[in-house]
């Protein structure tokens, strides 16, 4: 009889322990909002959640990379917008300077104006970002890409690239020689077949030198100066077309970054929903199970209490 009593006691204790464990499990799920708190709760879901968490982290990294890329590309576009305006202003000065009726003093004044535009363009070519890094220097960001005197490019040879999505990498920092020392393949050719000037600063230096040279007393000097101005005018047109080509590329990249951001946001929402489906609680089901398990636990307590109240005489009946 004592063996039977012990058996009943152990069974009741197991019932209480099991009910209490289940009740506490549902309580923990309700307090955390998670159905899968420990891997043992659902090994398959827990494993899938780990993989999904890694995908979420990668998506977040690409989002951050696109933010950085957008800032870099936007800054470059803003600077090149100013470069475009400066080149157009220089073109206007060169066209006006080609007027054969100007005096040497007028020409010298125009030379001063064009020198100011050259200085402005050189300053733009050596633009730095908020961290003091030169944006047109490639990976040599700590050194000014263009020399002050001749405007020669001394920056890095490789453009800065950024991985902005799993399968997309783009240039976010052009080297200065691709902008200020380059022309497009369909550039206006020189009438005599000679090589076209590619360096924007050399073009302007040629015009400045021609305008500073007095020509009032020499037809030959006038012709030489006019030829230099004509060549500069052709060069500026080629340089402007090159800058506009780069700006078109930047505009396309900004649009693409915006599209990738939209896709990334959609991907993040989908991943969040997937993660919720895997590990979050079903509140209706969990609350119902919590209440049912609480009721079962109370019943187990009552059964155990009732059993303890029984005498050996009552048990023997």
Swiss-Prot record:
GO biological process, one term: bacterial-type flagellum-dependent cell motility
Compartment(s): Secreted; Bacterial flagellum
Molecular function terms, GO-annotated: structural molecule activity
Effect on the protein upon substituting residue 168 to C: In HAP3; exhibits impaired swimming only when in contact with a solid surface or a semisolid matrix
InterPro entries from the UniProt entry: Flagell_FlgL (IPR013384), Flagellin (IPR001492), Flagellin_N (IPR001029)
Top-level taxon: Bacteria
Any one annotated GO CC term: bacterial-type flagellum hook
PANTHER family linked to this entry: FLAGELLAR HOOK-ASSOCIATED PROTEIN 3, FLAGELLIN
Entry's family note: Belongs to the bacterial flagellin family.
Stated name of the protein: Flagellar hook-associated protein 3
Organism of this sequence: Escherichia coli (strain K12)
């Amino acid at each position: 009889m004592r063996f039977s009593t012990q058996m009943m006691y152990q069974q009741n204790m197991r019932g209480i322990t099991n009910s209490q464990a289940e009740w506490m499990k549902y309580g923990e799920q309700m307090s955390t909002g998670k159905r899968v708190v420990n891997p043992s709760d659902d090994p398959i879901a827990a494993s899938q959640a780990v993989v999904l968490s890694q995908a979420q982290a990668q998506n977040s990294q690409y989002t951050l990379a696109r933010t950085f890329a957008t800032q870099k590309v936007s800054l470059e576009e803003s600077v090149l917008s100013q470069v475009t305006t400066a080149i157009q202003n220089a073109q206007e000065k060169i066209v006006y300077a080609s007027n054969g009726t100007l005096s040497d003093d007028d020409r010298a004044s125009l030379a001063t104006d064009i020198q100011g535009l050259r200085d402005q363009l050189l300053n733009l070519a050596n633009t730095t970002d908020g961290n003091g890094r030169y944006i047109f220097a490639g990976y040599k960001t700590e050194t000014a890409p263009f020399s002050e005197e001749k405007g020669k490019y001394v920056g890095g040879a490789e453009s800065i690239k950024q991985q902005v999505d799993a399968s997309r990498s783009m240039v976010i920092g052009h080297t200065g020689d691709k902008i200020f020392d380059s022309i497009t393949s369909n550039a206006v050719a020189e009438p005599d077949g000679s090589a076209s000037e590619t360096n924007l600063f050399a073009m302007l230096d040629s015009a400045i030198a021609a305008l500073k040279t007095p020509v009032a007393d020499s037809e030959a000097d006038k012709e030489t100066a006019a030829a230099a101005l004509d060549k500069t005018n052709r060069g500026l047109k080629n340089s402007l077309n090159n800058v506009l080509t780069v700006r078109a590329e930047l505009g396309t990249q900004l649009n693409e970054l915006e599209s990738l951001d939209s896709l990334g946001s959609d991907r993040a929402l989908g991943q969040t929903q997937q993660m919720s489906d895997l590990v979050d609680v079903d509140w209706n089901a969990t609350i119902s199970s919590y209440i049912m398990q609480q009721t079962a636990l109370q019943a187990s307590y009552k059964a155990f209490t009732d059993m303890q109240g029984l005498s050996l005489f009552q048990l023997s009946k």
